[in-house]
Amino acid sequence: QGALKNVTFDGTLNVNATQYLDIGGISKNNAGTIENCVSRVNINVDGAKVRVGGIVSQNVGTVKNCTNEGDIYGTISEAGGIIGSNGGALVSDCVNKGNITIKNADEYAYRVGGIIADDGDYDLPQSAVSVINCKNSGDLKTTQAGTGCTYMGGIIGVAMQRGTQTTVSYTNCENTGNLSARGNVGGIISYIEYGMRKNNATVPTPANLVVDGCWNSGTITGMEMDASGPYRTDVNMGGLFGSTSVSCTGTIYIKNSGNTGSLYLAGNTVQEYDTIGGIGRRIAMMSDNGTTPYFYVENCKNKGYVDTRASFASEQIGASQGDNIAVTGCDYSGDRYKTDADGTIHAYRADGSKIVNQFVFDGRYTYYFQADGTAMRDRLTYHPDGEHIIYLDTKGHEVFTNFQYCPSVGYTCYFDSQGYLYKDQITFVGNNVYYLNANGAMEQNGWFRFANGRDYGYGNRNGTIKADGWGYDPYGRVVFYHWNGMVARGLISDGAYYYSMDNTDGHYLGQFPVSQ
């Protein structure tokens, strides 16, 4: 219990496990609140299988506004970019940027999620569980070796109903990372299992799950499993969700969501039951002992490429089984998007013609398609007005209202609500102050001069600038930082004293009372 807030962790954690363990980039367990924390801890695991979370391994509390930038690699049974196994009521505004690679060298069933690997792993007292405004941009993959099966989702690996958990919602979450695995793969959720048996008895509690406003633009690649293992060798993947198994009374409701990611079969061999759905791979409804489950898919669009070599391939749902299933408002006949293996993005009109020399909005992101029909990526370029500069990121998405690291120029910039680059501007986010210099680069990691050529400031490692009063310059001399980050020069006062600061570099010279 308790709270952990506003902390950053760096480093590398190498684990040679001899037994099952829980490992977190920040904490093993959380029963309180983890908020505004960052992990840059790389986790490498060998030996026995373990459960890993980029922030926390086991969570029964609240996790908010946390970011994981560390990579996770090794022999891992459950791996989540933020949480390994979740039983908490709220996970919100979390971001995973770290890559996850699982070595599935045996017959185990692995669970991998960009945000949460296993959601619903505890008998919860709460009746509602919410995952809100979370994003994964890390690439998730399993190695080719071994006979294991993977449940991999861009946001959630496996969503299960257990105990008294009655309502779960995943709202406004998105995955832009690429997913590659053998087994079940879904752009948002890999596997939904509601009505799970415990000690051979059906869970009696009715349960509902809602997915609303979620989006996948990551490329999904399905690999066939080794025929010598205990699992079927088929490839199973869906743009939003993979497979489902629902037997308890209640409703699964997936709505207002979309996929623009491409779905590919790896290699040239096609299995008899390979199944791909642009929205979902398979819906299975299994009424049990008088239960009445319902499954609705509403207003969900697939705009991405679907590999038609699969035995069962659909723009919407690859396969379904059972009653009380409705798919409505999901027909789509507009622009289509295809991402090549090297990340090159193409867009096509409904008639198959390439889109060129044009900005295009896919419902979530804006792209610019060049004369050769490929999307501009990692490029600072002029807006059509010829005045403002915009940025298309490594996924081809125009950036709005956000700080963004631009690999092509090697620095972090800020883009406003219209996508325009900030240059020579001081900006405020919460209690933090930032300065974007004349080139648009965020000042960080040391002293800098403002574009006016006169004033100095100090940028911290995280890009915030000192704006909190008294401090020191590089020579150990006392200086004063104004609210806007500029080092004070000349005469300043706090109402009780006047302070004389050097007119050139701002170092402290002396003081005298205001009353003199």
Predicted regions and their residues:
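Surface-exposed loop/turn motifs in large extracellular/passenger domains
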Residues: 1-334, 341, 386-388, 454-455
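Extracellular adhesion/carbohydrate-binding repeat motifs centered on closely spaced tryptophans
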Residues: 334-516
